[in-house]
Amino acid sequence: MTHWAFSPIQPGAARNMAAWQIAGKKDGPYQIDVSWPLTWSESGDASGKSANAVYLVDGNALFLTATETLRRRESHRPSETGTVVIAIGYPITDSVFSPRRSYDLTPPCDHYIPPEGPDGSPKPEAHGGADEFLTFIAEIVRPFVELKVFPRVSFGRTALFGHSYGGLFALHALFTKPSSFDVYLAASPSIWWNNRSILTEARRFISGAALFSSAHPVLRLSFGSREQYPVRQRVESDEMFKRRQRAAEQRRMNDNCEELYSELLASGRLCKLEVKEYLDEDHGSVIGPALSGGIMFLSNLSA
């Protein structure tokens, strides 16, 4: 009879991953999780290697999915340029989303209209910190990753991925500081937020082409077909479904994405532009395919 031996390993340990907590902000620290190709050394010393980088906001919810997506691809395409994942999140253990995200991921605004809660009443949130958060990523996180963690790696394309408020943040970064990243992956962006004030930024970006002449960014928009047209869930009451329908109709996810795509396409301001609708996916379920599709989109740009 075979005797099997079970030896404990460090809880949650996985190859070629590391994490840091970043202190210095009065509202609380951040956490970054980083992964790199399995063909590199465990220390991340990859002298002479080149790589793309994808930065994720809401990092607690997205880091492992992005890492696994890339590792599956890399196992089949070993000669392809590798990708480093940098997930910016929060040191939390009881959820994958932090309340701090509403401040960090929403643009500053002169007049604020609170979003509605599930009962239809206004639900004010902390908001308007997107500029500060973008500066933190560009001036604190990115230099740490490129100069301290991977000083011998030559980085090529850099991408920013965000979903929902994170998608809104990606659009804000594109429209206000387009040279921050090469590729913007905006999944289910909350264009509806604050009476669609992000569209003012979009039109300023389009009309101010001369101000951003050195930036030739790429944008991929994505959303689920059931975001604007929800399907009733089996355990959902008539009242709950009607509330969800009303909210979906007001937020116009599908129409907003398609209209923004058309406006940007006509402007010719982007090096490449794509919109992708994922059939039978809602706002929550679309995260996986949108993230995977965004990573494939980035990888194919470099293929």
Curated annotation (Swiss-Prot):
Question: Highest taxon of the source?
Answer: Eukaryota
* Catalytic activity, as annotated: enterobactin + 3 H2O = 3 N-(2,3-dihydroxybenzoyl)-L-serine + 2 H(+)
Pfam families assigned to the protein according to its UniProt record, in alphabetical order: Esterase (PF00756)
Keyword list (alphabetical) reads: Hydrolase
Which Enzyme Commission number(s) are listed?
A: 3.1.-.-
Q: Which GO terms describe its molecular function?
A: hydrolase activity, acting on ester bonds
InterPro entries hit by this protein: AB_hydrolase_fold (IPR029058), Esterase-like (IPR000801), Siderophore_Hydrolase_D (IPR052558)
Family as reported in the entry's similarity comment: Belongs to the esterase D family.
User: Which purpose does this protein serve, as stated in its record?
Assistant: Displays specific enterobactin (ENB) esterase activity required for intracellular release of iron. Enterobactin is a xenosiderophore that is selectively produced by Gram-negative Enterobacteriaceae. The affinity for enterobactin is quite high, potentially due to the low natural abundance of this xenosiderophore in fungal habitats. Does not hydrolyze triacetylfusarinine C (TAFC).
Q: How does it assemble?
A: Homodimer.
Entry comment, domain topic? Contains a proline-rich insertion between residues 112 and 122 that forms a kinked, partly disordered turn that decreases the diameter of the active site, making it too narrow for the extended, flat TAFC, while the compact, cylindric enterobactin is still able to enter.
What this protein is called in its record is Siderophore enterobactin esterase
Species name for this entry? Answer: Emericella nidulans (strain FGSC A4 / ATCC 38163 / CBS 112.46 / NRRL 194 / M139) (Aspergillus nidulans)
Q: Which gene encodes it?
A: estA
